[in-house]
């Protein structure tokens, strides 16, 4: 039996946060966990939409030596659950993780599993779960030469340049099709968003007349895999190739630091046109207790 430990006190950045982040970094290049990169976890924990009051539903699994070997988690919204992440494919561990989900979710239980995680998928099938929705993880090989051209009047921020946090907020807000002016965060959310200023979050911006028009964030901290999130262009500058420019520039900067590939969780044609191909698929497995 593995011990189960709930995420404590519904606090974003407690001691367990560091443990989970380190764990996800260790398994980042493991194919069956690639859909929940540590960058996705960091983005989630700093996000203003995070369901903070449900954080204690996330659980850590430890072996008899107290070593962290797995986690069952949701992503940002509690409705986007559950992800089973593990460093070992022991059937006893995976069975215990599945049991946690079925006991926690009365009625309908859902688990997101990478189809490369063959042992977990087989256990889900044997437990009466049905495979339903599919999502893709796309990848691009960074041994390629990724070049681009910016339209006249635009330029990119230099790697070591200071970022205008208000412009950064505006490009994300308008890039996700919100109108008007975003509210300044306060309290806990403001503190959480400060976490996004870490160096492992590589940020590129396409700029015109001092205003940020497009942005790509890439998460990288060693290993083979860099993670792309988010990618946005403000509505008035779409269709100009800015998205391609900021993505290629961001992943080229990760390549300079040692990344061999970059991944994104998406099925969008935009990424296919950038030369990305399917790395794996993630299915939602559903079981009803009714």
Which residues are covered by each model-predicted region?
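Short amphipathic alpha-helix that is part of the acyltransferase structural core
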Residues: 1-42, 149-184
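Conserved active-site tyrosine of GNAT-family acetyltransferases
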Residues: 120-124, 271-272, 276
């Amino acid at each position: 039996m593995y011990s189960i430990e709930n995420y404590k006190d519904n606090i974003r950045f407690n001691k367990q946060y560091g443990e989970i982040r380190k764990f996800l970094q260790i398994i980042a290049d493991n194919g069956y966990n690639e859909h929940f990169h540590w960058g996705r976890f960091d983005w989630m924990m700093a996000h203003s939409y995070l369901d903070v009051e449900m954080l204690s539903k996330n659980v850590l699994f430890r072996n008899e030596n107290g070593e962290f070997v797995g986690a069952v988690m949701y992503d940002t919204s509690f409705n986007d659950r559950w992800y089973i992440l593990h460093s070992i494919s022991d059937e006893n561990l995976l069975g215990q993780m599945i049991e946690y989900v079925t006991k926690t979710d009365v009625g309908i239980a859902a688990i997101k599993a990478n189809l490369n995680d063959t042992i977990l998928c087989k256990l889900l099938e044997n437990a009466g779960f049905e495979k339903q929705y599919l999502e893709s993880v796309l990848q691009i090989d960074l041994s390629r030469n990724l070049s681009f051209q910016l339209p006249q009047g635009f330029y990119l921020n230099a790697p070591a340049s200071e970022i205008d946090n208000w412009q950064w907020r505006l490009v994300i807000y308008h890039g996700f099709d919100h109108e008007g002016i975003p509210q300044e965060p306060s309290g806990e959310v403001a503190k959480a968003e400060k976490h996004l200023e870490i160096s492992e979050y590589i940020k590129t911006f396409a700029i015109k007349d001092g205003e940020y028009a497009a942005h790509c964030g890439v998460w990288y901290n060693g290993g083979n895999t860099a993670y792309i999130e988010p990618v946005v262009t403000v509505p008035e500058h779409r269709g100009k190739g800015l998205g391609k420019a900021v993505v290629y520039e961001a992943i080229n900067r990760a390549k300079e630091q040692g990344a061999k590939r970059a991944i994104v969780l998406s099925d969008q044609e935009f990424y296919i046109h950038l030369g990305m191909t399917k790395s794996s698929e993630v299915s939602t497995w559903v079981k009803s207790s009714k």
